[in-house]
Amino acid sequence: MTRSSLTTLVPMSNSFNEEPQNASDASAAQPLDGNEAINLAEQQSKNTAHRNIPPLNLDEIPLADDTANLRQGPSLHDGLLALLPLVGVWQGFGQANDNGEEYAFGQRLVIAHDGENYLRFDSRIWRVDSEGNSVGADQREIGFWRISLKDEIEVTLTNSRGLVEILYGEPVNDRAWQIESASTIVTATGPAAHGPGKRLYGLMPDNSLGWVDERMQDGQLAPHMSAQLTRIAG
């Protein structure tokens, strides 16, 4: 996978003939200089800085609640600073090619922490029609991200379709992260044709989060899923 995959494979978040929500959405594909990027981030934070994942409101336990907002809750562990931009709640649309079956999907991705040296990763994906309307659930994926002192990323993921995966990788730069399958296990009722692969996550010029997943098919990597997500909390 090349770094350019992120811009060539990830669809725009205003797919399905949606009107752009604001001028920054309409110009998402346009490169920004440093000052423009900072100004855009400040503008966007006015809508998301006060939002967070809701507490459970159950009996207290002697542990900190998860937070997807770096302004609220426990401080981010110093060991996670290289992953800091990922923390938040992200939502948008994407495209999938699952062994020849192509479909569009919506996704909400929560990347949260509780002050310990890991990030919680929680993805929910639903299928959508050509107008962007939901036509039913697709899959869920939960797991944890860790990173060593040498900037080696370790990811464990469990997928509701019957998949367990361990991935390793490293930051591409301070706004992009690439991971690769080290072990992919499919359960007896899971998708037998699902092979190992690579993922690339990165912040786009408009500060949305894009990601690309490529999987081995017929001996070579092929596009599997990709999406572009807008920060809605954090």
Question: What are the language-model segments listed below?
Answer:
Residues L86, Q139-E141, G197, M225:
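Hydrophobic core residues within well-ordered beta-strands of beta-rich domains
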Residues T2, P85, W145, L209-W211:
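Bulky hydrophobic/aromatic packing residues
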Residues R3-Y118, D218-G234:
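Amphipathic/hydrophobic helical signal segments and adjacent flexible N-terminal regions
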Residues V89-Q95, D122-R124, F144, T156, ...:
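Residue-level recognition of well-ordered beta-strand positions that form the cores
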Residues V186-G234:
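Mixed-charge, glycine-accented linear interaction segment located at domain edges/termini
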Residues L84, A112-H113, R146, E170-P171, ...:
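Well-ordered beta-strand positions
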Residues A49, P54, G136-D138, H194:
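Signature of extracytoplasmic/envelope-associated structural regions
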Residues G100-P191:
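Central antiparallel beta-sheet cores of small beta-barrel/beta-sandwich binding domains
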